[in-house]
Design a protein with these regions (language model features):
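Residues at alpha-helix caps and immediate loop-helix transition turns in enzyme cores, especially N-
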Residues: 1, 21-24, 54-55, 86, ...
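N-terminal binding-site loop/beta-alpha segment at the start of enzyme catalytic domains
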Residues: 1-39, 69
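Short, acidic/polar
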Residues: 1-6, 50-67, 85, 110-114, ...
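Short acidic/polar active-site loop segments enriched in Thr and Asp
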Residues: 11, 69-72, 100, 124
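Short, well-ordered amphipathic alpha-helices
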Residues: 25-30, 59-63, 90-91, 112
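A short, structured active-site edge motif that brings together acidic residues
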Residues: 36-49, 70-79, 106
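CE4/NodB-like, metal-dependent polysaccharide N-deacetylase domain
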Residues: 55-76, 92-96, 148
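Beta/alpha (TIM)-barrel catalytic core signal, keyed to glycine-rich beta->alpha loops juxtaposed to Asp/Glu
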Residues: 78-178
Length: 178
């Protein structure tokens, strides 16, 4: 599927250790005829690995599983366990050039504020669930005020919201399909 997506023009692939598909993603990136620097790969550290003694091994497993020289974006998947220690590990690999950008996923303002206290590098992105019926305005505003890019996961509500009257009306207004 990833190879087909890349062939169709996709240039960003989002994966995670938890999804158990990093090897397939890496193979698609290596096997396609697109220069590596034109493909953006995001992966994430699962919260169970965000404990002292596991963080480095988790990232190294991701990098090895992908079979890539670097990851374009690496995120802390959830604000659970040792966030500060895990962030320090991400900063270390960022400084070594093994991660090009570091960020977080599912962090609310209170989590971002806690991280801000000890972080040397601010998160580049906060990947959060946003869809028409889950706006997360407080988190979006906080991120905008702190130059953190908001990236949506589940922006279509996993497809379940496409038949909602409000969505259908907007689509009809602009002569589009929901």
């Amino acid at each position: 599927a990833c190879l087909d997506a890349l062939s169709s023009g996709y240039r960003h692939i989002d994966t995670a250790a938890y999804y158990e598909n990093e090897a397939l993603v890496g193979a698609a990136v290596r096997d396609c005829e697109i220069p590596r620097e034109e493909i953006f790969v995001t992966s994430k550290m699962w919260y169970e690995d965000m404990v002292e003694g596991k963080q480095e091994a988790a990232f190294e497993k991701t990098l090895k599983g992908l079979g890539l020289e670097y990851v374009d974006m690496y995120l802390l998947h959830w604000p659970i366990n040792d966030v500060k220690g895990s962030w320090k590990v991400l900063e270390k690999y960022y400084e070594q050039g093994l991660i090009k950008n570091i960020g977080v996923s599912n962090f609310r303002p209170k989590h971002l504020k806690q991280l801000e206290v000890t972080a040397n590098i601010a998160p580049a992105v906060d990947q959060i669930e946003i869809c028409p019926f889950l706006v997360q305005e407080e988190t979006v505003n906080y991120c905008q005020e702190h130059d953190i890019v908001v990236e949506a996961w589940g922006p279509l509500g996993k497809g379940k919201q496409l038949s909602e009257p409000e969505i259908v009306a907007i689509a009809k207004k602009y002569n589009k399909t929901p």
